[in-house]
């Protein structure tokens, strides 16, 4: 034996089956991790007749139909590979198809898959060609009226103000995921308390194109509208950290579609992490200190296919106030949703936002400036760690919670800004008392 040969190498052995499967591996990072992941899989598949052959067939002929390749589902649904836990279908899709895959939110099963991860059966399909990657939908441009053709009966401003004045609670309502969401079948009708947005179908076809049957019924022509397109910004969101009502540290600009906000310290300045443990505050009290110790792994934000997800990876719950999420589930706009450890919730949907914006523009014309401006509130998400706020807590407002963050969604905000610029000045000046 050569004196420099490590002892561990004498006992390391990669089976021919593992070597064969690694031949289809995508990317060149984390070789050892991929090898251990494949080795773990081979040991499971060897117990099932024909499973190895089916996997090799799927990998070697990606365009051809293939059967499910399954492994038993663990208690928490995750698989541990070399001190790292992950969902099995995500792990093997990362190994054999998409090395940059971050989350299960980026995957959708094909119709041919009988054991997709989301079905929660005893077996889980890990065939990477039984899943597809979620694509970001292209949002149609919204059409901004050029002229002031105000019809009081079409205006939503009065309804908006009436609902805001009479239905805004002294303290926000509370909801817990997933319990409060199980009866939710989508947005509530417009007459329900707190709902100030229209609920008519999205008018994606306005104004009518020339020659269409209903052209004579439409009061508008193409020249009456100016299209404003959605553009994806370089940084999809920014995150500001607060302790009570004090901003602490610099704002974090998120360029990666997967961002971890935790309570640890990471001096490497990783662009995918916002480490709250690094931030100092001379006014910090014992309650804040104790809360910061419980943030732990914090929250994982994913921006996938035009949707934003928040996954609680802390041992303690997180609390989220998202008007977009509340509208989608039929809650009051100010409702605070509790996300327990290990759960994830969709907190923003670009397509829903686009529909609301298009509806407001179509129905309220000139006097809808204030109503459209109100949509800026939907582009901000507030989230507290460990301690909640609202009607069920002694803290009435997010600024009473020890540790919280405010997330600004740049794409929707910039889109709104362009729309409002095209609309011109508001009928009533926007102010703190408007």
Swiss-Prot record:
Polar residues: bias regions: 202-221
On modification after translation, the UniProt record reads:
Phosphorylated on serine by BMP (bone morphogenetic proteins) type 1 receptor kinase. Phosphorylated by activin type I receptor-like kinase-2 (ALK-2).
| Annotated localization | Cytoplasm; Nucleus
One annotated GO molecular function: I-SMAD binding
Q: Which residues form the MH1 domain?
A: 16-140
SUPFAM superfamilies attached here? SMAD MH1 domain, SMAD/FHA domain
Report the residue ranges that make up the MH2 domain in this protein: 236-434
Keyword Iron annotated: no
Residues bound to Zn(2+) are: 68, 113, 125, 130
Pfam family for this entry, one: MH2
Quote the cellular component terms of the Gene Ontology held in the record.
cytoplasm; heteromeric SMAD protein complex; nucleus
Query: Which segments carry the region annotation Disordered?
Result: 171-222
Fetch the SMART domains from UniProt: DWA, DWB
Keywords, comma-separated and alphabetical: Cytoplasm, DNA-binding, Metal-binding, Nucleus, Phosphoprotein, Transcription, Transcription regulation, Zinc
Q: What function does this protein fulfil?
A: Transcriptional modulator activated by BMP (bone morphogenetic proteins) type 1 receptor kinase. SMAD9 is a receptor-regulated SMAD (R-SMAD). Has been shown to be activated by activin type I receptor-like kinase-2 (ALK-2) which stimulates heteromerization between SMAD9 and SMAD4. ALK-2 binds TGF-beta, activin and BMP.
| Sequence similarity | Belongs to the dwarfin/SMAD family.
Q: How does it assemble?
A: Interaction with the co-SMAD SMAD4. Interacts with PEBP2-alpha subunit. Interacts with RANBP3L.
Q: What is this protein called?
A: Mothers against decapentaplegic homolog 9
Gene coding for it:
Smad9
């Amino acid at each position: 034996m050569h004196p420099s040969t490590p002892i561990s190498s004498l006992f390391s052995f990669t089976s021919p089956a593992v070597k064969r499967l690694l031949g289809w591996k995508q990317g060149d990072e984390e070789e050892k991790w991929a090898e251990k992941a494949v080795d773990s899989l081979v040991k499971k598949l060897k117990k099932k007749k024909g499973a190895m052959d089916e996997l090799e067939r799927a990998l070697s002929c990606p365009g051809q139909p293939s059967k499910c390749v399954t492994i038993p589902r663990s208690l928490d649904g995750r698989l541990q590979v070399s001190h790292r836990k992950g969902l099995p279908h995500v792990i093997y899709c990362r190994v054999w198809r998409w090395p940059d895959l971050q989350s299960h939110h980026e995957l959708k099963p094909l119709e041919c898959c009988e054991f997709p991860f989301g079905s929660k059966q005893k077996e889980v399909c890990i065939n990477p060609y039984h899943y597809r990657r979620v694509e970001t939908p292209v949002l149609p441009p919204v059409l901004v009226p050029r002229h002031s053709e105000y019809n009081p009966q079409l205006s939503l401003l009065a309804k908006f103000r009436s609902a805001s004045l009479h239905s805004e609670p002294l303290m926000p309502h509370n909801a817990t995921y997933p319990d409060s969401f199980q009866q939710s079948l989508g947005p509530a009708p417009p007459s329900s308390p707190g709902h100030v947005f229209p609920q008519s179908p999205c008018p994606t076809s306005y104004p009518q194109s020339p020659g269409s049957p209903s052209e004579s019924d439409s009061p508008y022509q193409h020249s009456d509208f100016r299209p404003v397109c959605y553009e994806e910004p370089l940084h999809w969101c920014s995150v500001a950290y607060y302790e009570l009502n004090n901003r602490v540290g610099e704002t974090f600009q998120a360029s990666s579609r997967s961002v971890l906000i935790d309570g640890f310290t990471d001096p490497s300045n990783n662009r995918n992490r916002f480490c709250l443990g690094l931030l100092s505050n001379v006014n910090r009290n014992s309650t804040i200190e104790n809360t910061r110790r419980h943030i732990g792994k914090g929250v994982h934000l994913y921006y996938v296919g035009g949707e934003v997800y928040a996954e609680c990876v802390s041992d303690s719950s997180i609390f989220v106030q998202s008007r977009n999420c509340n509208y989608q589930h039929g809650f009051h706009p100010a409702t605070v949703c509790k996300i327990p450890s290990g759960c994830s919730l969709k907190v923003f949907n670009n397509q829903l936002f686009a529909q609301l914006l298009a509806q407001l523009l179509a129905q309220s014309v000139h006097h809808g400036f204030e109503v459209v401006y109100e949509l800026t509130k939907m582009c901000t998400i507030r989230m507290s760690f460990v301690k909640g706020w609202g009607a069920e807590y002694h803290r009435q407002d997010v600024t009473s919670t020890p540790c919280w963050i405010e997330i600004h969604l740049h794409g929707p905000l910039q889109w709104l800004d362009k729309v409002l610029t095209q609309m011109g000045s508001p009928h009533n000046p926007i102010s703190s008392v408007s």
